[in-house]
């Protein structure tokens, strides 16, 4: 029934990037169908790899106006609903606002729960000291724990995060390591496990957010990057001529952002 409902509403939806930000357009419909087809074999026993390729391709059509954000970190900052580079990658967002849409869930949870008072400022004055990373995630960026920099800075604590990104050669390695251990040995000790800095209530333009506690940061529910990943997997699973090359080109587009 999900497929039939998506088919029935498509023509009533706005063209790509023509809906108000935060409302679903046709690209959101196509991306959800691509997700559905990627997992069709699980649901129905019948693979639909080519349909997944087709609908991911519809989302990725350059004429739609969507594109990859050149700065990964800005996708998860307070002005991701205003910053043109971030907005162009976000197909559908869960809207957040520190004044108009206060909630103890959403991006507030993602920022406050990963924050401690000794960490770099991330735009909230309410650190909860709950969530940090397991080493399995860190291992995706550092095959050898000895390569992780544990630098300390008194004034510019964000420089530690930049050191980690530089050592990992990956801007997604948004970890804070000062005073931390890579191994999560004690669940009740916040400094066991690296702190995760992906989400913040800071703005890319340096201006203040609406509220010092509750974030403005929208949650990118559907992003263009997902369409690349769906199509790459579908290419490989479908097989055939140039399958590996086509999949690699989609992954390379993400790696080269």
Q: Model regions: which residues?
A:
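Flexible, polar/acidic helix-loop-strand segments at domain edges
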Residues: 139-224
